[in-house]
Amino acid sequence: MKIPVTVAPASRRKKLPGRRRYVLLLSFILCMVASSYAREAYKYKRIGGDLDAQAMADTGLAMMGGGTDLDEAFKWLCGKGHGGDFLIVRAHGSDDYNKYVNKICQMNSVATLIVPTRKAADEPRVAQIIRKATVIFIAGGDQSNYIKFWKGTLMGRALNDHVVAGKPIGGTSAGLAVLGQFVYGCMEDKANDPDLTSKEVMENPYNPRVTLLREFLQVPLLVNILTDSHFAKRDRMGRSLGFLARIVADGWSKDPREIAIDEKSALLVEADGRAKVVGPGQGVYFLQVTEPPEVCKPGQPLTFKNVSVYKAPAGARFDIRSWNGEGGEPYSLSVEAGEIHSSRTGGAVY
């Protein structure tokens, strides 16, 4: 049976006022934009198991100097996670690490979390993903983005909780730069700026681009320590000496230390602070301040003497707690009026 339907003549149909139609259309568009933005605020790409593993992790710290990724370092870091869930975090970029880590490690899952804004870093789901990870690796990129986007957010707190819980963590390049208590933040660098050079810093330790910060993360073994990467490859010794001088001159520490790692090198640190150096790069440089800088003032060349250095090549061992090593070479460096002088034969800095 057909049910008759009465349709009002066109002349009797009510039309929405033009202003109301405009408001409804605008509201619809804004809702769609907001929904799209919420979906794109962060990206999470995962391979492997859909359910999180209940793996017990061992404390470990994988500090990588950038350049070619080292299978040995990643396998060591994965081993600390005992088959749990491996999470890569970054502000921009791709999920290329997923396939790489999944190929060389036996993990329940490997995922990449890309968090490009503070709004995204304050999403509860982002913090939840981090809290469920067994192992976290901070990828390379631009450390100023990590600081601007993540510090003081739900994500930042979740990262620190991961460290406090004793779970394994690692980082390379910019990801290494934010592991120490003291951080060179690149906060004043523009997109196309070249690297801040050793010459620039030694000529003026208060160069506006020397932006130092504290406690992005609170890794217990890295208290009072500055971390840097691409070290010998990019000739960063002079700028590191300038950074350490600034830390003293600004009253942050009387005797700061630095762990500086060259490209294709890594430092694998156990829970008790004992570490080994791996990789074909020039290794790891452990710096320690022994006396305050004589001259560390705005617009003046740096004078800073007797900074102790321990160069640790692949195979060397170093105890971060006692600050002693074996298998490496100790020497000292001084800066006088912006020029480096080394105690090594031939005056070699690296």
Model-derived segments and spans:
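Catalytic nucleophile loop
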Residues: 139-140, 163-183
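Bacterial N-terminal signal peptides
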Residues: 24-33
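Sec/Tat signal peptide C-region and signal peptidase I cleavage site
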Residues: 34-38
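C-terminal and late-domain segments of enzyme folds
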Residues: 39-83, 189-350
